[in-house]
Design a protein with these regions (language model features):
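Active-site-proximal gating segment of KS-fold condensing enzymes and close homologs
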Residues: 1, 52-74, 119-136, 195
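Conserved catalytic cysteine-centered active-site region
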Residues: 1-32, 63-70, 132-155
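Beta-strand segments within the central parallel beta-sheet cores of soluble alpha/beta enzyme folds
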Residues: 5-10, 35-41, 85-92, 110-115, ...
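Active-site-proximal alpha-helical scaffold in enzymes
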Residues: 11-40, 76-106, 162-169
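Flexible glycine-/small-residue-enriched beta->alpha junction loops
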Residues: 28-79
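N-terminal extracellular/periplasmic Venus flytrap/periplasmic-binding protein-like
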Residues: 85-173, 178
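Glycine- and Gly-Pro-enriched alpha-helical subdomains that act as flexible
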Residues: 172-205
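Conserved small/polar residues in nucleotide/adenosyl-binding loops
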Residues: 206-213
């Protein structure tokens, strides 16, 4: 109904996760009994080269203006993760995703979307059968002597997901199947050049096994 409130959350890559944090926190305090967290990604709306923010010389001197691919190269170098290891991981990821689609593991999670009555999107277009020779032939995408290529990077994507979060009492009262339980939440900052490591320190607050996993 029109009386239901909503808000927009911006924490870049972690925006939808932050929405989950906010809803679960409000459920714990008793403000609400349930809420829906929605995440939307529309990389096609971002112009080539980004939105051209105002250039600041002092920030440039401190290397603030680096791309996500460059931060990934830093982590790969520090972790001694070779190109071969990255490509092997990428190939296995595609193979697992394709196997899951073929065996209907996502059927209950995907909502078919009708596009102007012309065609229906009901499957992720990202996974593909890996062409190992082509993968090996690709040039580094972000640094001249880097190890990361287009094959081991995320594709340009458009998509959305949603999750219903309720209190246990509300779920049981309304016969809602409980598929997961939120045990805790945390937000932590890291050096911007290592932004890909962001979630790990927060995970370590709850379990000593997170680093090994």
């Amino acid at each position: 109904p029109n009386t239901v409130g909503g808000s927009v959350v911006n924490r870049f890559c972690g925006s939808s996760m932050d929405a989950v944090h906010q809803i679960s926190s409000r459920i714990e305090t008793g403000d609400i009994e349930m809420g829906i967290a929605v995440g939307i990604e529309d990389m096609f709306s971002v112009p080539m080269g980004g939105f051209n923010p105002d250039f600041h010389p002092e920030l440039a001197e401190q290397e603030y203006y680096i791309g996500m691919g460059e931060t990934a190269e830093i982590l790969a170098r520090e972790g001694s993760i070779s190109r071969d290891e990255q490509e092997e991981f990428a190939i296995k990821s595609h193979e697992k995703a394709l196997d899951a689609w073929e065996n209907g593991r996502f059927d209950d999670e995907v909502i078919p979307t009708d596009i102007y009555g012309e065609y229906i999107i009901d499957k992720d277009e990202g996974p593909r059968v890996p062409d190992i020779e082509k993968i090996k032939s690709l040039s580094p995408a972000f640094m001249e002597n880097g190890t990361i290529t287009a094959a081991t990077s995320s594709p340009v994507s458009i998509g959305a997901s949603a999750i219903l979060i309720t209190s246990r009492t509300y779920a049981e009262k309304n016969s809602i199947q409980i598929k997961a339980t939120i045990k805790g939440r945390s937000i932590v900052g890291v050096d911007w050049r290592r932004m890909g490591m962001g979630p790990l320190p927060a995970c370590l607050l709850y379990t000593s096994d997170a680093a090994d996993e």
